[in-house]
């Protein structure tokens, strides 16, 4: 039933995109109508079949729902690409759509600017809807249908801890979506002030706040050659990398809790540190001036750490030592509870504190050293979960890299592709640097 509701919501999104096609008088409007008809039909059927079903979801139901929702949304979301012949291969159409909904930003398209506006708008919208989570949106509307969203929230949450700012999870989701939409609207206005037209501004705002990285231009943000646009997008990519429950604290004027958050401090500190180091190296190893070195390094660090994947420069042309630093950034990621990928900063904070405690145990074997974050003790079970998650994450990267190398792909490109895919980055290393 919930999958059916999701598909009906996707149908509404198709109609919005058809409105864009109508505005530009382009033929892809019919493609959206056809896709919408098919999606609405299946959605109504599933909703009818699920009528009268269990309204309380278990944790297992939540995980199953999240998994099926991503697949279902992508399967039907690829229809406009496939029906219109813009991506004639089903596998490629599914790849492009899943890349959008997962906010990965990897693409198989090599002539983006030839696509009609409606298709480009849909391509950008997939990142915005998928960025914060299709399921998070669903949680906000589930109470209307008498369904609990707590287990869905637990399955969708991206960090080791799940923060709520209101006892009712549906209200929390609505607040978060309001902030998400507000940030997007503000960014649209600022980009238009920088010279972007309304269409490109909306599409790039979707890609920025959803940290997806799909651009309406083949050269990405570099197309505009505008320091103003680069700085604005950098700031909003950084904001989008912050835990949205923290942004709620900021909106509610709880500035002390906001500023004192351990994960936010780590996130901000890592951006400052990596930007400073890369800017200095660029200044002395490239023809860039001081301001340009700072701007390029700031943009690329935030773009990769937030897994957005926008590009203003070909970083594979930088000195090789910077490739290693950028790889670390890609692995690390931004904050849990944001639209970003990667391991997440909160796990880095926990790993750092666990490592520090282990060194202290060498000197004081009998000492009891709990892991504390934001003045709260982290339970051993959460610490174990974090360690297991990081081990599995790195193991998948190693195994995936070896498998790609076995298929004849170079080591650099193999590792770049795997890190990019598992972390929802988009760009990778080597030949997959700018277009993946």
Regions found by a protein language model. Name each.
Residues 1-436:
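Membrane-proximal intracellular helices of multi-pass ion channels
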């Amino acid at each position: 039933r919930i999958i059916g509701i999701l598909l009906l919501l996707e149908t509404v999104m198709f109609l919005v995109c058809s409105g864009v096609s109508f505005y530009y008088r382009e033929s892809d409007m019919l493609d959206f109508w056809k896709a919408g008809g098919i999606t609405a039909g299946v959605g109504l059927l599933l909703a009818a079949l699920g009528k009268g079903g269990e309204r309380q979801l278990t944790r297992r139901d939540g995980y199953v729902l999240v998994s099926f929702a991503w697949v279902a949304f992508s399967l039907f979301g690829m229809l406009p690409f496939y029906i219109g012949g813009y991506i004639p291969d089903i596998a490629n159409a599914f790849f492009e759509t899943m890349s959008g909904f997962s906010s990965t930003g990897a693409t198989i398209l090599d002539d983006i600017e030839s696509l009609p506006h409606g298709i480009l708008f849909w391509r950008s919208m997939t990142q915005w809807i998928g960025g914060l989570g299709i399921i998070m949106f669903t949680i906000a509307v589930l109470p209307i249908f008498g369904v609990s969203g707590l287990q869905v929230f637990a399955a969708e949450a991206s960090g080791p801890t799940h923060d709520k700012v209101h006892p009712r999870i549906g209200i929390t989701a609505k607040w978060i979506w309001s902030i998400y939409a507000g940030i997007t609207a503000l960014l649209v206005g600022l980009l238009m002030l920088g010279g972007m037209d309304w269409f490109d501004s909306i599409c790039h705002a979707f890609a920025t706040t959803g940290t997806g990285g799909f651009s309406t231009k083949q050269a990405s943000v570099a197309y505009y050659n505008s320091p103003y646009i680069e700085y604005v997008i950098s700031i909003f990519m950084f904001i989008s990398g912050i835990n949205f429950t923290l942004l709620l604290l900021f909106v509610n004027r709880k500035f002390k809790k906001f500023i004192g958050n351990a994960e936010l401090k780590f996130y901000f500190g890592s951006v400052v540190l990596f930007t400073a180091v890369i800017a200095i190296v660029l200044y002395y190893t490239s023809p860039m001036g001081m301001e340009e070195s700072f701007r390029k390094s700031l943009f690329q660090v935030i773009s990769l750490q937030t897994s957005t994947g926008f590009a203003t420069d070909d970083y594979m042309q930088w000195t090789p030592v910077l490739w290693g630093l950028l790889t670390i950034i890609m692995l690390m990621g931004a904050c849990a509870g944001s639209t970003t990928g990667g391991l997440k900063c909160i796990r880095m904070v926990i790993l750092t504190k666990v490592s520090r405690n282990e060194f202290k145990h060498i000197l004081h074997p009998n000492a009891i050293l709990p892991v504390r974050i934001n003045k709260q003790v982290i339970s051993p079970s959460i610490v174990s979960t974090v360690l297991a998650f990081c081990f599995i994450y790195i193991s998948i990267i190693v195994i995936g890299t070896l498998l790609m190398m076995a298929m004849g792909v170079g080591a650099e490109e193999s590792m770049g592709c795997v890190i990019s895919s598992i972390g929802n980055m988009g760009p990778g290393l080597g030949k997959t640097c700018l277009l993946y």
